[in-house]
Amino acid sequence: MKKINPTQTSAWKALQQHFKEIEPIHIRHLFHADPKRSEKFSLTFNDLIRVDFSKNRLTAQTIEKLQALAQETDLALAICSMFSGGKINETEERPVLHIALRNRGNQPILVDGQDVMPLVNAVLEKMKRFCHQVIKGDWNGYSGQTITDVVNIGIGGSDLGPYMATEALKPYKNHLKMHFVSNVDGTDIVETLKALNPARTLFIVASKTFTTQETMTNAQTAREWFLKTAGDSAHVARHFVALSTNIKEVTNFGIDPENSFEFWDWVGGRYSLWSAIGLPIALSIGFDNFEKLLEGAYEMDQHFLKTDFTHNIPVILALIGIWYSHFFGAETEAVLPYDQYLHRFPAYLQQASMESNGKWVDRDGKPVGYQTGSILWGEPGTNGQHAFYQLIHQGTKIIPCDFIAPVISHNAIGDHHHKLLANFFAQTQALAFGKTEQEVQEELMAEGVFSEKATYLAPFKAFSGNRPTNSILLKQITPLSLGALIALYEHKIFTQGVILNIFSFDQWGVELGKKLASGILSELEGPEKVSCHDSSTNSLINCFKKWH
């Protein structure tokens, strides 16, 4: 990928000038000036997803100038490089090929001259056979009983993606009960194991190296718990499978190498749910539905690869994000799913975005002089409305929001879904258009409030509006549409990283704390006071040793 400082481009300078013209304009005015604004600023993907970005502080000219920035930073070349297996993860000298994992067209994708698709397809076929065995009851535990519960032990991308997707696709789940353990805090695994029967529980240990501290600590605890009942360590092979490439350590643990599912170093953890890491998803919803998840992502991949930037949904959403973070000074963005099944979607995107683009040096290794990754957060609606929407509506910070909702609910009970979606539509309208003090005064007086009190209350009850949102409607949450939605955000994140001249596919920021923790671990044993760190860390460690 080229190494272009976006702030030095002519497109960036044009956007700076354009911002001065746009900044004072209210969204209310933009709609009044163009009755067809929504039609012009909406895109539909495969009759599955509709994205309305009309309630933003931008014009057609803004989009044109943002697209010029994408062109000047050579986004098109970067996209082609990723899809063709170029080693765009330069600091680790690796390609970035999560797109190969869902390459349903089976086009050859080369890494160092070798087509990776036969490897990908072989692992998928192995996953398919295993899932059918477990789901149909042909895979029995040591006592001859079938499996009823599956515990996924992983962390980061080995947990967030599978957990999010199994929750989102609960309407498609079978009889298997899914559990996820990630935190090294013993409470996590202890509470999970309390209600489980060792003879009917299958553990998935997800660690590429099979050395990840948190994952292997939890896996060893699970193994000890299992053997208290099973007794014979040979039984581990029927109750533990691995998602790993370290066959030696997998075998040492007691797992049959035949029950280890491979993935590759060109798959980043936060982009790995499409790989063997997605085994818990496939076990939960069945392999046919897992393939539909891959199909939805593949269709979005093709849209991203082949669609002109003017109609390219991931590119447009990425550019809008840059518009707010780098010109309006927005520091956070909220993802607000109006569907309880998507309750873990913001947490999943939080890792995908912040671990990818939370970088302080550019692709030349020099400190950037501009913002990179935004802080991403969110909660399901309508819960959030009774928690933090106050600040979004009337606070002093600009917080761009993505509102996400399905048109068709999987649980059409009474008028629940109509009330939910009424709130969805109302919130984006209120954020965009607000309510003036004059409108508040007139309403209050119409309700019988005296003029003096109405004047007093008006500033507190007024809404400035002009708060930006994107509305993303899914026809329904299905494996196909969820796959497309996840891939949409993946490509949005990639696009922003390209334009901002940073590497989105490494994560060196997680290493220092892990290394320090490894050294501190041995210091927590014994009565000796610790004095080898800074005064604060020494004091905290010594307090722990005193109270423990």
UniProtKB/Swiss-Prot annotation:
**Domain of life, source organism:** Bacteria
Species for this entry = Hamiltonella defensa subsp. Acyrthosiphon pisum (strain 5AT)
Give the lineage.
Bacteria, Pseudomonadati, Pseudomonadota, Gammaproteobacteria, Enterobacterales
EC number of the protein: 5.3.1.9
What name does UniProt use for this protein? Glucose-6-phosphate isomerase
Q: Kindly give the InterPro entries that the UniProt entry links to this protein.
A: G6P_Isomerase, G6P_Isomerase_C, Phosphoglucose_isomerase_CS, SIS_dom_sf, SIS_PGI_1, SIS_PGI_2
> What gene name does this entry carry?
pgi
Q: What PROSITE patterns does the entry give?
A: P_GLUCOSE_ISOMERASE_1, P_GLUCOSE_ISOMERASE_2, P_GLUCOSE_ISOMERASE_3
One GO term of the biological process aspect:
glycolytic process
Q: What reaction does this catalyse?
A: alpha-D-glucose 6-phosphate = beta-D-fructose 6-phosphate
Give the CC-aspect GO terms.
cytosol
- Can you say where in the cell this protein is located? Cytoplasm
Q: Which SUPFAM superfamilies match?
A: SIS domain
GO molecular function list: carbohydrate derivative binding; glucose-6-phosphate isomerase activity; monosaccharide binding
Q: Does the keyword Isomerase apply?
A: yes
The role this protein plays is: Catalyzes the reversible isomerization of glucose-6-phosphate to fructose-6-phosphate.
Q: Where is the active site?
A: E355 (proton donor), H386, K514
